[in-house]
Amino acid sequence: MLEEYRKHVAERAAQGIVPKPLDATQMAALVELLKTPPVGEEEFLLDLLINRVPPGVDEAAYVKAGFLAAVAKGDTTSPLVSPEKAIELLGTMQGGYNIHPLIDALDDAKLAPIAAKALSHTLLMFDNFYDVEEKAKAGNEYAKQVMQSWADAEWFLSRPPLAEKITVTVFKVTGETNTDDLSPAPDAWSRPDIPLHAQAMLKNAREGIEPDQPGVVGPIKQIEALQKKGYPLAYVGDVVGTGSSRKSATNSVLWFMGDDIPNVPNKRGGGLCLGGKIAPIFFNTMEDAGALPIEVDVSNLNMGDVIDVYPYKGEVRNHETGELLATFELKTDVLIDEVRAGGRIPLIIGRGLTTKAREALGLPHSDVFRQAKDVAESSRGFSLAQKMVGRACGVKGIRPGAYCEPKMTSVGSQDTTGPMTRDELKDLACLGFSADLVMQSFCHTAAYPKPVDVTTHHTLPDFIMNRGGVSLRPGDGVIHSWLNRMLLPDTVGTGGDSHTRFPIGISFPAGSGLVAFAAATGVMPLDMPESVLVRFKGKMQPGITLRDLVHAIPLYAIKQGLLTVEKKGKKNIFSGRILEIEGLPDLKVEQAFELTDASAERSAAGCTIKLNKEPIVEYLTSNIVLLKWMIAEGYGDRRTLERRIQGMEKWLADPQLLEADADAEYAAVIDIDLADIKEPILCAPNDPDDARLLSDVQGEKIDEVFIGSCMTNIGHFRAAGKLLDNHKGQLPTRLWVAPPTRMDAAQLTEEGYYSVFGKSGARIEIPGCSLCMGNQARVADGATVVSTSTRNFPNRLGTGANVFLASAELAAVAALIGKLPTPEEYQTYVAQVDKTAVDTYRYLNFDQLSQYTEKADGVIFQTAV
């Protein structure tokens, strides 16, 4: 084992990275070596045991905890690990398999003092808290000590407070840094391996950034040169962390700019991030990791500057001269406690433990922790989002600025974040989900899986289902197109993908750490954002699509001065706020998702859309059949699916919807008259905020066209198919087609559209996200593309690609003529589709499709109604 391990260490060192943590097999071999250590290897073996095993409920942690527990009890021995040392080391494992041995040790006079100290600093107790409480009530003095320590928050007060002054060297990335820059999609396979994945951070050359190997390895030498100044680095940018929800982006930044976490291999916390604007999901993942994110004017900060940051005073000064460079206010003073606790999640869990202990001991509420500021009283009404979150918190509504922990009814995870979420769940010692429904998809890696992806496909489903979650299968399709069909109206949820934007209810997408917390505990921390209201009125004009309305939102915000495309001094009224949409109440739920989905591109924290009951009743009636069909097809966890079906049936029995109050307050209101939108609206390369009229970009030569992503539904493919069916000869473009789900693909095949796509020479992808994310399939380098996908960030769909975002209808026309049409040309083409619009824009109602109803009708529930 040692020979193999040292070989691995050497291989990783050649790559410039630390070795992987030990796995269960290596840990089992290490146990045998610890029992009879080879001469001269003692120190090395102990270091492996202490520092190279993941904590929580990792498989290797199970072996480690079992060995240490056996040593503590005297069931086995090691010349290197005494029973006392074994208890001490169990105390470094955070939670999970180490807890019962520590609680048992409270009854051993020799080991109890060490066990008490260890438990006093262990937060992941969950229901094991009551075992300690029971011992304390029975008179165990050491259990009493533990209870008192928790009540006194010694776990928190023993950690160093946030410093008055933090001296750092500036690592500045000008313009906008999105999470794809920090965690590139083609490298998604390596995300759980943080040191390896971090090497790809900023691997594409840009102003001020010098990758070691452009397109492969990021600016490691540049970072190392700055570190030689003797101070930690701070990540600084004009706009930081937009785009996908990748916790891996935070992990990569902190690998270079954070602090080691004692006894936790290959993971770092802490760190400092300064941004003119910091995207909300990235801000949250920084908080969760114990970093200090600060929104501040960074125009006076330059690469390599040494600065002093005063978090309490809200000042940034030049380290040498003391010159004031910028001032700021922390988003909340609770950030100070979050940094001290090692992150927002440890703080929340720890505060809860302290509260529980104080209640058990009959003590008043602790005054140790900073509280979120009280929100000013208001006699005004609540918005729809405020009411939804309020209901999830058991109150009428939640005011902007208030801290709350809403109940998570639905949680989604996908396969490029799922392996990290799995690791986070292990760290949280989670063996069962508390959220009502947790769903795992395999949409980002199904098309062209690497061996590591195949391993994920084989191992992650059982991990999720064993904890009560629902697992999809590779090839099933896009996470959102499935999760939306499992939703309950007016409920709150989250997902490990920035496009988790419920069309009924509301979701606050998050990084994998927060998603794991939400799944494990059934709640999520939230500083309630303000809302921006977008009101549509009037009638849609001929040829105009919902995608044009999606792009009308940034266009009209630009017109009102609420949004700028320029990154320096960026204005974005939507950033960190909730986008609330009214004026389109009769949309089908599938259509409504097109609007809520795109709130991700606005950097909004979440989105609601006001719909009438009828489309929601139709949608849930269809979805009940789909979920029953899933049970018939052997999907699990069956109990979770049955419970969700019962929840849908209960709502349908009395279909009531929340509504915004007429006097609700909004940070801004944007009115859009549909009569004024007379031509398609696109987003120009390479910025989803850069909305343009078709007439402004007409004639642009197009090389490739992509019709697919979570922004599409079956109607879009019928529309494209009808346009393509009229075309004779070869297309002048390369056309990609990827339906969102296997159900869409099956129906399109049955209706003959796959034949049309095939004859047109289209490259038909399996349902999923491959090209949209750009992690597997890619367009040609430097291609000009029209895409129905979500984002057009630089290098996302292809290296150096210029991507226009547009409707499926406009994309199909561009595929046919090899350029962006004039508005008149476009109208000529779409008139062909409009003639059969009723047939084209039909949606998947599973209750009307015999291949689903026949199987659904045979399902007999195994749980009581």
From Swiss-Prot:
What CDD domains has UniProt attached to this entry? AcnB, AcnB_Swivel
GO MF terms held by the record: 2-methylisocitrate dehydratase activity; 4 iron, 4 sulfur cluster binding; aconitate hydratase activity; metal ion binding; mRNA 3'-UTR binding; mRNA binding
* Cofactor section: [4Fe-4S] cluster
| Keyword Cytoplasm found | no
Note accompanying the cofactor annotation:
Binds 1 [4Fe-4S] cluster per subunit.
List positions binding [4Fe-4S] cluster: 710, 769, 772
Question: Which Pfam family name is an example for this entry?
Answer: Aconitase_2_N
> Gene Ontology terms, cellular component aspect?
cytosol
Effect of loss of the gene: Cells lacking this gene do not grow on propionate unless glutamate is added, and the addition of glutamate does not restore growth to the level of wild-type. Also unable to grow on acetate and citrate and only slight improvements are observed when glutamate is added. AcnB mutant also shows an impaired binding to the surface of macrophage-like cells, is less motile and possesses fewer flagella due to a level of the flagellum protein FliC lower.
UniProt keywords, alphabetically:
4Fe-4S, Iron, Iron-sulfur, Lyase, Metal-binding, RNA-binding, Tricarboxylic acid cycle
The record lists the catalysed reaction(s) as: citrate = D-threo-isocitrate; (2S,3R)-3-hydroxybutane-1,2,3-tricarboxylate = 2-methyl-cis-aconitate + H2O
Q: Which amino acids does the record list as binding substrate?
A: 191, 244-246, 414-416, 498, 791, 796
Instruction: Supply one GO BP term.
Output: tricarboxylic acid cycle
Q: What is its EC number?
A: 4.2.1.3, 4.2.1.99
**Pathways per UniProt:** Carbohydrate metabolism; tricarboxylic acid cycle; isocitrate from oxaloacetate: step 2/2; Organic acid metabolism; propanoate degradation
InterPro entries recorded for this chain? Answer: Acnase/IPM_dHydase_lsu_aba_1/3 (IPR015931), Acoase/IPM_deHydtase_lsu_aba (IPR001030), Aconitase/3IPM_dehydase_swvl (IPR015928), Aconitase/IPM_isomerase (IPR050926), Aconitase_4Fe-4S_BS (IPR018136), Aconitase_4Fe-4S_dom (IPR036008), Aconitase_B (IPR004406), Aconitase_B_HEAT-like_dom (IPR015933)
Q: Quaternary form?
A: Monomer.
**Family the entry assigns:** Belongs to the aconitase/IPM isomerase family.
Q: What does this protein do?
A: Involved in the catabolism of short chain fatty acids (SCFA) via the tricarboxylic acid (TCA)(acetyl degradation route) and the 2-methylcitrate cycle I (propionate degradation route). Catalyzes the reversible isomerization of citrate to isocitrate via cis-aconitate. Also catalyzes the hydration of 2-methyl-cis-aconitate to yield (2R,3S)-2-methylisocitrate. The apo form of AcnB functions as a RNA-binding regulatory protein which regulates FliC synthesis via interaction with the ftsH transcript to decrease the intracellular levels of FtsH.
| Annotated protein name in UniProt | Aconitate hydratase B
Gene symbol?
acnB
